[in-house]
């Protein structure tokens, strides 16, 4: 079990995600489903992701955020804003190239009247493996350094999914 959690809320069509604790791949399936559901809505005006409460974020969840950035760009919607005031997380975001595809700020008022947790889902075998693969491919697509950094991880997932 992960001690991380992702809370969500919205304000005037802007979806807000608040990451807390150690955000690991155990949350990725639920987060991806939530994001896919939200991105199908016609009234979405943007996304803000508050990372100030996160202790750590694994590469799978970073990859899901990269997919979100790409989806917003394809839909001609505003760039996703990441809020991060932690040097370690800021260094990680820059290392994977998020400064090129996200608006990263140290502070922003994200007070919401109502928030709810995105509950984790049980692993669904191949579906989870495919999501892990897609998330890491999204990271690889950001820059050459990521292509090198995640090549072996992607290859391992591809091998696992071969019939």
Model-based region annotation:
Residues 1-53, 70-163:
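STAS-like cytosolic regulatory interaction modules
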Residues 65-69:
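Histidine-anchored nucleotide/phosphate-binding helix
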